């Protein structure tokens, strides 16, 4: 299709199970006009070609995801698979991964439309098959995967066979560069995503000024982890990059519908978000074009706010509700079974399941030449002089080592408070490193823990400071009676300087989040990719040997 009119018709028609609602078409057409007027893209024909390409890449990636669960190989000619082509024991979080494909391809589309590479964060790490399938198709794989996974039939078949193969090398470590969750071998990943709710706590603290992040969130995590609704309370244009949260609202957990759907679905969630300072928008989560539109619009909203000279906080923070069904685009969608194995039976052993699989794969099939053209169109990195998605800045954090002031050592045989000494030294550390953004995770006890000077210097971050209290609109101390939420602020700030202070017993609530960070960092070191961020101290106080003021309530 060479004419602009044909290109427009082509993308509007959708592809396979992907259809574009009239609302999505109108929204994207308006955005394309604006991008052309702002010279962010050359012309409408270029934009339309990208939109059509995204549909085809998404369909192919969804097919690869289904194959990763059930099959031993893929046939890129589209021929149906026989019984021996299927795994004896299929495994994979298929439904969520299928839903993540349009979302992740929509993220790629947004980058291609605007000529900028954003970072990404996925809370539902068990949906890694979606990322790996798309990365293999685009060729944007990690160093360990290079030469093993690509978009050839052989390369995709290796990816498919390796998934949940449980292969172990002679050292007892995974023998293939592919895991059940996002990891350092997942190109561009910055978090394991094993705990669904932690991405919702971290995303607003992750990008530095000048950066942009897209965070894919789980609707199941909405009921698992509290604290994500405070993002508008923490975001500041002066020291934060842009962040776009996208909830994949597929409505199902493992055994039943999510609480959101039971309460009223997307409309109910949108109302709840408005009460917490968000500006939600509901889109078609089955459509990569809708995802891309929402990303660009949300980012532009934050950019317009940042350009104002008379900013007042909190900002009405954009929040994207991507409404879909569990396992979209494949047989078994919208059922509880879609969470893991959507087909009714193993295709290796059951003819009916095999027929359903082959029919589902056929509906998603994209001919080789058409797929190659689509991938070439999306790969405009060189043309726009932008990095590949795996090289986004948040995936390559290496801040310069901080200047470490000499501590004011206390003379021997003189009693004193260790916390007070730490307090004095941390003040000097923060003052000596103004180039590093500081985040203090504080569950409301910093002064009680004898760090009053640190609090006086850095201050609680609030929207409206109270006179006479160490508070500031731009404070660096993230304070809330939620240990995970405040620890997340420090752990997400990998381009800066961080500290977490808590009572011993309360610190236990942070262990899941800290465990996830340690696992990811440990795997990076094992793979010869040691993390470059500055170590984050976690100080716990009120030990049993220290005092008995609160008995064992504040102690372990």
Descriptions of predicted regions:
Residues 170-244, 293, 448-556:
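Thiamine diphosphate
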Residues 86, 113-117, 212-213, 277-279, ...:
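Short, surface-exposed connector motifs at secondary-structure boundaries
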Residues 121-123, 241-251, 441, 538-540:
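Short internal beta-strands
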Residues 121, 282, 319-321, 439-442, ...:
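Structured core elements
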Residues 179-372, 546-556:
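Glycine-rich ThDP/TPP pyrophosphate-binding loop and its adjacent helix/strand module
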Residues 2-48, 281-289, 295-438, 445:
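Flexible, low-complexity linker and terminal segments
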Residues 52, 66-74, 120, 375-532:
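Non-catalytic terminal/interface segments that mediate subunit docking, oligomerization
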Residues 50, 55-80, 88-91, 96-238, ...:
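Cofactor-binding active-site loop characterized by glycine-rich and histidine/acidic residues
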């Amino acid at each position: 299709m060479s004419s602009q009119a044909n290109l427009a018709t082509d993308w509007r028609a959708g592809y396979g199970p992907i259809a574009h609602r009239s609302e999505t078409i109108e929204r994207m057409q308006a955005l394309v006009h604006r991008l052309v007027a702002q010279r962010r893209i050359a012309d409408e024909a270029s934009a339309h070609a990208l939109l059509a390409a995204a549909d085809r890449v998404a369909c192919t990636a969804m097919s690869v995801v289904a194959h990763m669960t059930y099959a031993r190989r893929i046939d890129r000619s589209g021929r149906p698979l026989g019984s021996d082509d299927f795994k004896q024991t299929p495994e994979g979080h298929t439904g969520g991964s299928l839903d993540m494909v349009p979302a992740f391809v929509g993220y790629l589309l947004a980058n291609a439309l605007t000529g900028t590479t954003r970072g990404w964060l996925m809370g539902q790490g068990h949906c890694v098959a979606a990322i790996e399938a798309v990365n293999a198709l685009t060729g944007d794989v990690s160093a360990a995967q290079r030469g093993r996974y690509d978009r050839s039939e052989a390369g995709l078949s290796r990816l498919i066979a390796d998934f949940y193969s449980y292969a172990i090398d002679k050292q007892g470590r995974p023998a293939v560069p592919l895991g059940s969750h996002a990891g350092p071998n997942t190109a561009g990943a910055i978090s394991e995503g094993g705990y669904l709710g932690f991405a919702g706590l971290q995303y607003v603290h992750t990008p530095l000024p000048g950066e942009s992040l897209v965070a894919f969130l789980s609707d199941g995590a909405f009921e698992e982890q509290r604290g994500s609704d405070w993002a508008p309370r923490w975001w500041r244009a002066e020291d934060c990059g842009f962040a776009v949260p996208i909830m994949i609202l597929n409505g199902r957990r493992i055994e039943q519908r999510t609480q959101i759907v039971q309460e009223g679905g997307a409309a109910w969630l949108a109302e709840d978000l408005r009460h917490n300072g968000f500006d939600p928008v509901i889109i078609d989560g089955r459509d990569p074009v809708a995802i891309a539109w929402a990303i660009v619009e949300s980012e532009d909203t934050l950019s317009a706010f940042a350009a104002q000279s008379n900013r007042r906080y909190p900002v009405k923070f954009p929040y994207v509700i991507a409404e879909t069904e569990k396992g979209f685009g494949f047989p078994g969608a919208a059922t509880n079974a879609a969470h893991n194995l959507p087909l009714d039976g193993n295709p290796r052993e059951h003819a009916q399941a095999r027929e359903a699989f082959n029919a589902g794969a056929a509906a998603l099939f994209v001919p080789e030449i058409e797929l190659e053209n689509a991938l070439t169109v999306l790969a405009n990195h060189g043309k726009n002089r932008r990095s590949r998605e795996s090289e986004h800045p948040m995936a390559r954090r290496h801040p310069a080592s901080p200047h470490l002031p000499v501590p004011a050592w206390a003379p021997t045989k003189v009693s004193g408070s260790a916390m007070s000494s730490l307090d004095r030294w941390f003040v000097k550390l923060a003052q000596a490193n103004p180039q590093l953004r500081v985040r203090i995770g504080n569950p409301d006890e910093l002064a009680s823990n004898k760090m009053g000077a640190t609090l006086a210097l850095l201050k609680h971050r609030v929207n409206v400071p109270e006179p006479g209290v160490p508070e500031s609109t731009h404070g660096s101390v993230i304070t809330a009676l939620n240990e995970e939420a405040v620890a997340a602020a420090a752990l997400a700030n990998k381009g800066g300087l961080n500290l977490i202070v808590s009572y011993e017993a309360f610190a236990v609530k942070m262990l899941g989040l800290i465990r996830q960070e340690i696992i990811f960092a440990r795997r990076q070191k094992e793979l010869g990719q040691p993390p470059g961020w500055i170590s984050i101290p976690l100080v716990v106080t009120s030990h049993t040997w220290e005092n008995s003021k609160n008995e064992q309530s504040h102690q372990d």
